[in-house]
């Protein structure tokens, strides 16, 4: 499996703070021109359609949504100015969510084999920060943002997703030792988590 040097990914269930921490790093490194901060779904046309589906403005099947995620990821990697171009220029790319989210969520919505077949050819990042926190902590944070779904159903769904992430990263540690998986205790305060991530980035990338 191909490993992309200088490609760093943040993963975790909703409410663990991946987006919050990516924005904090973007502010911290705003003066640097050799760092790129991005996310999936992207802000492109395919990514925008995905967001419309996730927000129930557009209705489609789970399989169709999985295909859209794969198409968005392919364009994110291979498109002009995408991840591969940035890495080729010697930049460090940090991304909020990547292939692991699809393996978890499309694996739950359709099947693990479907998600794997769609995503097996994508290269892996050099480093993954896996944000983990108890479900009740995540639900409390999501509720504070205005949760618009039935609480029990949402909690059950996220419990399954958390187990899915744990299974995937346990397998990754065994199958792909060249990809570093760093588990982050996302229960801690935002500033504490931010400093932990900075420590690891400095350790691996010698960042200032």
Curated annotation (Swiss-Prot):
Name a GO molecular-function annotation. ATP binding
Q: Which UniProt keywords apply?
A: ATP-binding, Kinase, Nucleotide biosynthesis, Nucleotide-binding, Transferase
> What reaction(s) does this enzyme catalyze?
dTMP + ATP = dTDP + ADP
Enzyme type, top EC level = transferase
> Any idea of its EC number?
2.7.4.9
Query: Which PROSITE patterns does UniProt cross-reference here?
Result: THYMIDYLATE_KINASE
Q: Where is the signal peptide?
A: none
SUPFAM superfamilies associated with the record = P-loop containing nucleoside triphosphate hydrolases
Concerning Pfam families, the annotation shows: Thymidylate_kin
Which region ranges are annotated with the description Defective ATP-binding?
Answer: 12-19
| Keyword Membrane applies | no
User: What's one GO BP annotation on this UniProt entry?
Assistant: dTDP biosynthetic process
One of the record's GO cellular component terms: cytoplasm
Keyword Transferase in the entry? The reply is: yes
Family named by the database record: Belongs to the thymidylate kinase family.
The record's PANTHER family line, in alphabetical order, gives: THYMIDYLATE KINASE, UMP-CMP KINASE 2, MITOCHONDRIAL
Which protein are we looking at? Putative thymidylate kinase
